[in-house]
Amino acid sequence: MKKTIFLATLTAAIFAGCSSDNPMLPVEGGNGNNGGEGNNELISPTVRATVNTPDNAQSPMSGILEVYPCQAGTSIYYGNYVEDVLTPFPGMYTLKDGNTLGNPARAISLPVGTYNMIYWGTPKYEEPIYSNPAVKDPQLTLGGDLSQQYFGLRQNLPDTTYYPVFDLVYAVKPANIGTEELNAAMKRKVAGLKVIVKDKNNGILSSSISGMKVNIGGIAEKLNLYTAEPVNQTKTVTFPLVLSTDGTQMSNATVMLFPSATSPLFQLIITLKNGTVKTFKQTLSAPLKANTRLTLTLTLGDIFSEEETGNFTIDNWQEESETI
């Protein structure tokens, strides 16, 4: 599959620094407190990354990468030196073709020693995805346990539904600062969903339709920062469909979702210009899994059989899943 998804607002929206409910005060100076080396010199290693492809090979990554240094062999967050002060802010890099592009927004700067590096990023794609993704960032503190922190869904207030998320890739790998580069092989930890709605006669969609949106249930509430495992697959994500320029279909640019529970509930909600709301519901035949994209093509049945709010039929339902 061609690479999909572009990266327009990522730096501001997902990787714009870290916050904490109980922030620890910064520690000044390179004190070498990284598990035994005792070296005051701070090292900023070269950073490279690859990302998995549909055939399970790795290709050089372009996009945004964040690096979270932990104490060796643990999920305990060590932190990162910024201007010789130990802070909870992770390293932040823009990558092109696997290599750092220009000066990093925030370089990894650490004393010589062994660390457990956690990597999260969003690759840049040639084709667009949903333009308004959002996530809740983890709360980072020096010495905190990253296995108790999460990337979470952001609620679509005042509604009870949630926004789609960014395309997130992840890796964990030990590193010896001072003797080696940082080189991460990233794997995608979210699923993609694309919905296409057509008229049953392959003609122009009815001018009586004001809008369409999709609700997809059984979506994980959050991903563990340390393990990338999905948690609490009970939430509903919503997104709109957009009318094509020729008026023959409504669809969405691929949305990214945290993995779902088995047989998530799909709802297509159509609002007519007279205010009537029509809803179609059906469970998907399989869960939305990390590193896959489901394209769902629907052919509308008769949505005008009832004058009042009610259901409608789908004449054709086609699910096509692929690795991304």
PLM region spans:
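Short helix-loop boundary/capping segments
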Residues: G192-A253
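Short, low-hydrophobicity acidic/polar segments
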Residues: T74-R188
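Beta-strand-rich extracellular modules
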Residues: W120-K124, K198, T271-G275
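Bacterial Sec-dependent N-terminal signal peptides
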Residues: T4-D55, N291, E307-I324
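Hydrophilic extracytoplasmic domains
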Residues: R48, A261-I324
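Compositionally biased low-complexity segments at domain edges in trafficked proteins
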Residues: Q148-I204, L294-I324
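Solvent-exposed, conformationally flexible loop/turn segments
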Residues: P174-T179, T245-T248, P287-R293
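Structural motif
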Residues: R48-P60, I196-S206
